[in-house]
Structure formats: structure tokens, C-alpha cells
């Protein structure tokens, strides 16, 4: 098993055989026409992709894209999405490995967020468990009705941001006590 990642490639640098495998994996995993960006678009436009190879075949993949919509934001954010695993490889911790690759690469400097379909579905229950085990928390009041049903937001805040936030709260409490 090999875990590979790619970031900010130019379209000419991309191995089209691999991207076709990833696009097919994504389409099969989601069981419908995928609206999400293709591999080429994702990693050539400030994006990141991780995928797992077993016997020269891509069996799991996930995408990430740095959020550039709010340049005045105090913290960098990255939207991670479209985690897919071939059916016969599910339950082996591959999604967790992919999510941890994003955390390793961006978790100290970025707030990571995703949306996950929360309607009853065993695959999504497993996905939510995976994300929760990787340090994401569900934001129950932040959801939208998407083409595939109700989706909730999940977020993982870098340790440095959490520590800074706790220090501010302690300072406010100590000022109130005086």
C-alpha cells in the first residue's frame, strides 16, 4: 500500500491514467454523477489530493482546496471533500489515513472543514465516525440541503488557534474577577 499526495500541479504534469482512475472511483463511490471538480481542476487551482495505491490501483482518494474566498480572514481555511474508497476496501482505515494526511500537511496552519451527508446511510455513519476520530466536530446548526440530501458542516480547528482562543478567554475571566 502506498499513500501519495499532489499539490498545485499544472495540467500538463498530471498523469491522466491516474486521474481517470480517481474520477471513476469517485463516481462509483457516490453512486451518481459527481458534480465536484475533477482531479485536474482541483489540484491545478490551489488544491491538494491524496490517494492510496494498492497493486498499482487507486483504491481511495480525497480532495482539498484552500479557501481563498475571504482574504481578510484571520485564519487560513481548507475545504476537504469527496473522500472515496472502493467498496471492497472499506472498513480498513483508508479514509482515516487520507484525512490524517490532510491534517499532517495543513492541520497546524489551517482550519479544516467539510460537509457530510447526515441522512441515514451506513456509509455516512462510518464517514462521520472517521472524521470525529480525526478531531472534527459536527456543527449541528450549520447545514444545507444539497443535491444528495441534508449535509452538515464538520470542522477541525488547529491546536494553535484553540490555545490562542483559550488564552483570550482566561484573560477575560481574570479581568472580570478583579
Describe these PLM feature segments.
Residues 47, 108-111:
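Short, high-confidence coil segments that cap the C-terminus of an alpha-helix
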Residues 113-128, 144-150:
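Conserved beta-strand-loop-alpha-helix junction that forms the acyl-donor binding cleft
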Residues 81-90, 119-121:
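A short, internal acetyl-CoA/4′-phosphopantetheine-binding micro-motif in the GNAT/acyltransferase core
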Residues 8-82, 86, 99:
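Acetyl-CoA-dependent GNAT
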Residues 47, 149-155:
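Short hydrophobic/aromatic beta-strand or adjacent loop that forms the aromatic wall/cage
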Residues 1-17, 160-168, 173-178:
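Conserved N-terminal entry element of GNAT/NAT acetyltransferase domains
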Residues 85, 91-104, 129, 133:
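Conserved acetyl-CoA-binding loop-helix of GNAT-fold acetyltransferases
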Residues 131-141:
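Conserved acetyl-CoA-binding loop of GNAT-fold acetyltransferases
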Amino acid at each position: 500500500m502506498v499513500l501519495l499526495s499532489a499539490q498545485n500541479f499544472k495540467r500538463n504534469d498530471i498523469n491522466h491514467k491516474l486521474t481517470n482512475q480517481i474520477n471513476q472511483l469517485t463516481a462509483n463511490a457516490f453512486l451518481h454523477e459527481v458534480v465536484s471538480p475533477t482531479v485536474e481542476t482541483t489540484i491545478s487551482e490551489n488544491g491538494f489530493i491524496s490517494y492510496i495505491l494498492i497493486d498499482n490501483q487507486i483504491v481511495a482518494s480525497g480532495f482539498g482546496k484552500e479557501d481563498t474566498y475571504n482574504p481578510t480572514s484571520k485564519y487560513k481555511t481548507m475545504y476537504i471533500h469527496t473522500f472515496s474508497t472502493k467498496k471492497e476496501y472499506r472498513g480498513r482505515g483508508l479514509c482515516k489515513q487520507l484525512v490524517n494526511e490532510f491534517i499532517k500537511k495543513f492541520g497546524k496552519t489551517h482550519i479544516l472543514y467539510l460537509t457530510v451527508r447526515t441522512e441515514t446511510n451506513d456509509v455516512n455513519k462510518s464517514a462521520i465516525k472517521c472524521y470525529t476520530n480525526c478531531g472534527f466536530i459536527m456543527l449541528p446548526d450549520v447545514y444545507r440541503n444539497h443535491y444528495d440530501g441534508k449535509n452538515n458542516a464538520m470542522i477541525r480547528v488547529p491546536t494553535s488557534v484553540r490555545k490562542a482562543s483559550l488564552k483570550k478567554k482566561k484573560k477575560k475571566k481574570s479581568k472580570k474577577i478583579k
